[in-house]
Amino acid sequence: MATVSDLALLLVAGLVAISLHMQEAGAVKFELKNQCEYTVWAAGLPGGGQQLDQGQTWPVEVPAGTKGARFWGRTGCSFDASGRGTCKTGDCNSQLSCQVSGGVPTTLAEYTLNGDGNKDFYDVSLVDGFNVPLSINPTNSQCFAPACKADVNAACPAQLKVDGGCNSACTVFQTDEYCCRGTHVDNCSPSSYSMIFKNQCPQAYSYAKDDSSSTFTCPSGTTDYSIVFCP
């Protein structure tokens, strides 16, 4: 027969299990804020999209356990009342509310929630090029807040420059060496082009294999996040 202490232990274990399940099934809050002097049309997969004038914010709740997700900013957009239109950079199939990834060049805030080791993984990426400065800011002050604050467009070489952004070398030249694929999938080094990005934004991914200095973690369930354009 179970004793009172046995029942108490079972009750505590049950409450812990329920709490962990609720935490995993809950949502993580992201707040996107535009501090740029121009309008940014924020986008997220998941999330959709929202026009943000200077100083405006957009709250987005993302299910815990979401993997391979991203936020980005679009510029030079024009949409009609139905939410159809075009953007100069970051366009997502001509939709205000994005259901697909944005076109290059685009600065990305990438993340995975509740990944390996019960950690959130996040990074600022210039692998798809650069269009808007941004930062990822965990509300947990013990976790690092990576940022790309520089105007990379000002340092963009002519071969990579487009209206409103700076393409990656992979996008422009489509070689295995620049794209870290084929014969270079396991042997990919920084290029003179990716080093321009790295020098401007040391905390951001500058090419596909730039993991060691550009991926950050925070214990899952301990934080929400803000994404700031022009931090």
UniProtKB/Swiss-Prot annotation:
It comes from the Eukaryota. Residues 1-27 form the signal peptide. Disulfide bonds join 36-230, 77-87, 92-98, 143-218, 148-201, 156-166, 170-179, 180-188. One of its GO terms (biological process) is defense response. Pfam families: Thaumatin (PF00314). SMART domains: THN (SM00205). SUPFAM superfamilies: Osmotin, thaumatin-like protein (SSF49870). InterPro entries: Osmotin/thaumatin-like_sf, Thaumatin, Thaumatin_CS. PROSITE patterns: THAUMATIN_1, THAUMATIN_2. Belongs to the thaumatin family. May be involved in disease resistance. This is Pathogenesis-related thaumatin-like protein 3.7.
